[in-house]
């Protein structure tokens, strides 16, 4: 058994529970009112599942409310952003490129990693 890696973020935290050369799994805990980066990925392909809370989600030109029990697929080169309407918990599974983040806009002053 291994212990997950906890990564503190300005909007909450990530719990990395799986990361190998084939896939990655994370839990994102986003505090109410916080906004993640407007971003895209060059290679990373991810699927997100909203476990609890409510989010406003931007994917390309579409903005919609995201509710518990719904999943969203984010292929590479898809511009996207999440905003927590309520404290939210998201399950993310993806290809293993966790450092593949191209930030286009960030409320917290972070740049591309």
Features from the language model and the residues they span:
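Double-stranded beta-helix
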Residues: 2-9, 81-113
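A short glycine-rich, His/Asp/Glu-containing loop-to-beta-strand
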Residues: 2-39, 44
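Short hydrophobic/aromatic-rich beta-strand segments that constitute the beta-sheet cores
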Residues: 25, 37-38, 57-59, 92
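Short, surface-exposed secondary-structure edge patches
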Residues: 27, 47, 61-64
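Glycine- and acidic-residue-biased ligand/ion/polar-headgroup-sensing regions
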Residues: 43-56
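Short acidic-glycine-tyrosine-enriched beta hairpin
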Residues: 60-79
């Amino acid at each position: 058994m291994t212990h997950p890696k906890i990564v503190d973020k300005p909007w909450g935290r990530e719990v990395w529970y799986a990361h190998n050369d084939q896939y990655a799994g994370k839990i994102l805990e986003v505090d109410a009112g916080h906004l993640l980066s407007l971003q895209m990925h060059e290679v990373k392909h991810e699927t997100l599942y909203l476990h609890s809370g409510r989010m406003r989600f931007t994917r390309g030109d579409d903005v919609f409310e995201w509710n518990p029990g719904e999943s969203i697929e984010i292929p590479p080169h898809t511009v996207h952003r999440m905003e927590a309407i309520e404290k939210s918990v998201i399950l993310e599974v993806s290809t293993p490129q966790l450092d593949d983040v191209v930030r286009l806009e960030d409320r917290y002053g972070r740049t591309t990693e």
